[in-house]
Each structure stands twice: as C-alpha cells, then as structure tokens.
C-alpha cells in the first residue's frame, strides 16, 4: 500500500490516493487514521487524507488523529492540490469536500483555496463563533499564541467541552500586531497544531470585522506565513510540500493496538530515504 507524506505550514498528513481503487475499506478508515497518525507506532501525522481525482475536480476526505472525520481542512486542501498537480500531472479547479465545493487556483508556488461558506455566525461573551468550513470559536488574546500557547490549553479545553454536545469546536486564538495576525488553533480531534488553515480564515474574518475592513490579511502561524484574501472568496493562500512517498509492508490492521509498525520510504540508490524536492 502506497502513501504520500505531505504538509501545509507544518500541518502534516498521510495522503492516500484512491482514484483507481479503494485502498482502505470505508469501515476501516477511522481505525486506519488512528494508527497512521500515531507518531510512535504508525507513520505520524495530524490527519489522513483520502482522495479521488476526476479532472478538473478532486474529492477529498480528511480524518483526524482520533479517527473522526472533518468536513474541511484548508492546509490539507492545498496539499491535495499540490499532489494532484505535481504527481498525477492533472489540473485542479474544484475541490469537493463534506463542506461543499471549493474553487482552487495555483499561482506559481502558491495555492489558493476558496472557503465560500466562511462567515461569522455569532458574537458571544468570550469570542466569536465562526463557520470556516468547520466550526471555530475565535478568541482574541494579548498573549502570543504561537510561542506561549501552553497557558491557553486549559481554557481551550473548557471552551471545547462546552461545545462538545454539538459536535465540538476548533478553538482559535488570535493576537493582532502592527502588520500581521498571529494565530494558533486547538483543533477538534487533534489538539494544538503548528497551523490550521480554516482557523486562519476564521481569525482573519474576525480581525477584519473589528479592525478593518481589509482586502487581505497576513497571518503568522507556528508553521509559517499564510495569506487570506477577503475581497474574493475568501481565499486561503499558502504553500504545500510533498515530503516523501512511502509503502506499508504487511497488514496495518495487525498493529492497531499501537504496537511498533514497519513502514518504508522510497529509497535512493544509496539506500537513504529519497525525499521529493518541493518546488
């Protein structure tokens, strides 16, 4: 079984191409995601992405580390476009997810993904409820959420627990500065990640609502810089990287109890792992 390791702003994923055939049976996908995302006994990732390409569109499904399925993921979306464009050699114009259809554009090394349904739904006492393909609770903070996020964990878990009866929520902290927004998200089904694409969009909407309006917002995350165009879309703009191609040996189901799992990378003639160069 082949897979690809990819990341967008260090939000990393195991990508499985099911265009030709179903690689992982539907009933096994949650268990596979839990195993594959384990950084000690699996491959290691924040999520698993399954795709089916049908140019000019591609279908994407994203499963979180805990096995739950998410409606949308902005960073995974860019990774899918990168893979289909560079590995499959196909043009992508529409990305289909559980949250709906998203227009995509490739602009040199940058990939733009439209999040047409993004909007502020409700202002509450501690922050803002935002739909950015998935639900977010955006909270402005004076604390730097990139480096000083540990002190926010208890509050993030408390907010999450309040929304758990409704399916949970992604808790996004945003700290405005002079020329950029600094953002970090406690993701539903994952926890803290270096970057959350939908969280970046959600925070940008709130930032523009309070301090704007702005046509574009520059956002810094622990995984790098992203841009959100609010004049058309909105559009989440950033890069994506293909790290390596891997192959699973044996049956992963035998190791869903989190025992050590063997997997191999594509090897160069020297015997070292071959890392695909990102352009």
Swiss-Prot record:
Keywords: Amino-acid biosynthesis, Cytoplasm, Isomerase, Lysine biosynthesis
GO terms for biological process, alphabetical: lysine biosynthetic process via diaminopimelate
Pathway(s) where this gene product acts: Amino-acid biosynthesis; L-lysine biosynthesis via DAP pathway; DL-2,6-diaminopimelate from LL-2,6-diaminopimelate: step 1/1
GO CC aspect terms: cytosol
GO molecular function, one term: diaminopimelate epimerase activity
Name of a matching Pfam family: DAP_epimerase
Function, as annotated: Catalyzes the stereoinversion of LL-2,6-diaminopimelate (L,L-DAP) to meso-diaminopimelate (meso-DAP), a precursor of L-lysine.
Family that this chain belongs to: Belongs to the diaminopimelate epimerase family.
Protein name: Diaminopimelate epimerase
